[in-house]
């Protein structure tokens, strides 16, 4: 029996009128079913601890699904009930980076994932 992979595409978006605000994600990830993956989102051009960071999922041909958000100042999180056991949100304020770890990956997790301020 052959092995299979799950493709995760990463993207970022920032709100506001300031063109220098940037959220950077590294690109695509290829992982095996059952594995975990940690996605990163590096922020620049604004005070990282002043805005919540949201994570959103989009599968081909489907709408956006809000996964959850984290307050970089306090580390407090709020999750969509559907993703409570799937995703873990964390931040590293020293590098202005937000992370989302996805657990026990399946084909249903193959999607584009956005971080959004």
From Swiss-Prot:
Checking Gene3D superfamilies in the record gives: Immunoglobulins (2.60.40.10)
| Region described as Complementarity-determining-2: spans on this chain | 69-85
Q: Which GO terms describe its molecular function?
A: antigen binding
Q: Which GO terms describe its biological process?
A: immunoglobulin mediated immune response
Q: Where is the signal peptide?
A: 1-19
Q: Spell out the SMART domains in the cross-references.
A: IGv (SM00406)
Does this entry carry the keyword Oxidoreductase?
Answer: no
**Annotated region Framework-3: where?**
86-117
The domain of life is Eukaryota
What other comment is given for this protein? This germline gene belongs to a set of closely related genes that could encode V regions of NPb antibodies.
Residues of the region (Complementarity-determining-1) are 50-54
**Start and end residues of each stretch annotated as Framework-1:** 20-49
Q: Where is this region: Framework-2?
A: 55-68
Q: Per UniProt, which keywords does this protein have?
A: Adaptive immunity, Disulfide bond, Immunity, Immunoglobulin, Signal
Q: What is the lineage of its organism?
A: Eukaryota, Metazoa, Chordata, Craniata, Vertebrata
Q: Which GO terms describe its cellular component?
A: extracellular region; immunoglobulin complex
What is the name of this protein? Ig heavy chain V region 186-1
Q: Do you know which InterPro entries this protein is assigned to? A: Ig-like_dom, Ig-like_dom_sf, Ig-like_fold, Ig_V-set, IgHV
Q: Report the record's disulfide bonds.
A: 41-115
SUPFAM superfamilies from the entry? Immunoglobulin (SSF48726)
